[in-house]
Swiss-Prot record:
Family under the similarity heading: Belongs to the UPF0725 (EMB2204) family.
PANTHER family: (RAPE) HYPOTHETICAL PROTEIN (PTHR31260:SF77), CYSTATIN/MONELLIN SUPERFAMILY PROTEIN (PTHR31260)
Protein name from the UniProt record: UPF0725 protein At1g23970
Transmembrane segments annotated in the record for this chain: none
Top-rank taxon: Eukaryota
InterPro entries in alphabetical order: MS5
Amino acid sequence: MTTEEESLSAAEEGYNVQRDYWRQAEESDGFDIENIKLPPGMHGRVMGLITYNCQLCYRYPFPVLVKLYAKFGLHRYNLIKGTSFELAALMKFNMLQNYMSSFYMTLLAHDPDPAASSSQKTFQVRVDEQQFGTLGINCSIARPKHEGDLLEVSTKTPFIPHFHGGALGDGIFKGELPDCLSDDALNALMEAVSKDELPEHVLDDALYARAGGIFQGELPDWPSDDALNDGKRFYMLKESEWQATDWISMYLELVITTTDRSITETVQKPEVLSKLEIVKVAIETATKDEEPSNERLKAYRAHFYITFKGLAEPRAPRQVFEIGEHVERQAIVRRVMGHRGDLTLKGKLCGGQYIKRRSLALKSGEESPNCKKQTRVG
């Protein structure tokens, strides 16, 4: 065998081993991969998932962020099923070796509701990062483990280690949301709502999206004070309403930690998040202005405009912010439930001054604006 033939044979063998690795990973949807078998000499040569056992190892990448992703998965489940599960403990997770990764998390969650059938369950949650340096995540799997009726996996979308759109269905979301661009799709949705197969606010969301909507594309700018006073467009939450939900503060923490990952690198950093104080929250949805506020809170498509303070030194790409914990800051978060039940969050910090990119090679004696002590550039 010539050198070229040996090289081709080795490449083909590596390809087959790589393909077989992901075939084995697919059997558990990427969650239980500890027993995947590789041929001798192939360990370290296969690009696959890295496994972290959080019960045995206290040091793992981005501990704060991973737990927020786990909470986000439970939030998706609660939003669809009407439950109140909370994170009890992160047991293990698998992730890709990429800047933007997919996280396959196994966790314990408990439902504080006394009427709940079981106080604690094991959950599996998959979260895919869709952007780096800002909030852009998608959750397509959030389900109790070992519950057959909830482990139905759609065959419409094959297992893909990392994706930027579309969801691998997990059977939690019963029925599909039509795209609502055609009359037939809209009529089908209206029929599903009339039969109580889907909540009414889903129809409101769809009608708004059909009319053009605002829950696509780039995030909006922060609205003016006059616009926020428009009660038909915005609903200003009462303090008791946003305090009664733990997920609004989770949205804010996700915006901050995905923008500045240094906060998530050590277990000591959560003190930054503990100082956050929400001042007010406005919601923009597709639901009617006369709908009860709790319906707006459950809307599958919504913008959340969060005013807060307590973050001394915000960091965001190519932005400069005023420094000080006393400064009131702004964050926008978009929540969208996809037509297969995947939940997406996009978010950003507002209020910073954008700066232009400059050459790294400064002229002799020229001082970089990044060195000024009064401001901090993300």
